[in-house]
Amino acid sequence: YGNASSLHSAGQKARRGVENAREQVAAAIGATRKEIVFTSGATEADNQAIRSVAQMRPNGHIITSSIEHAAVLSTCKYLETLGHSVTFLKPDERGEITVQSVADAVRSDTVLIALMRINNETGIKTDIASISQLAHEKGILVFCDAVQAFGFENLNVNDLGVDLLSLSAHKVY
């Protein structure tokens, strides 16, 4: 139970455990260990990812959907109070957020697209790879909440083309 930041033996043992976990997560999703940041959970990860982009690109436009997890919706609504504009896409008749609906929402000031890979209530999958390709052609960052997908489908950050991705251990432990 040592502090992983401490120099004593218990701390160093804890540090090795954290770094081993970091390597395992990176290998599981095709990332490098330096790209893995641990948070207290999915809500903090979602919040940190979205707010970090918003801070780097003030007053930019964000695209998300009206059916995202509350952690994403709340963060985006908060950012509206700080001067960001947010488009909340509505799903189509099949419950999907389509690549075309995202493309139609893109503006010259769009800085982030924040969408989940698999909806936690409907199970509908979003084509994150195609959305990422569209976004990157326009210099837009992509954040994917993949909490529902992790452990249920093969996730690879390179195949998805995302810049930021959130996962949660409680779905796979």
Which sequence ranges carry the predicted segments?
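Pyridoxal 5′-phosphate
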Residues: 1-173
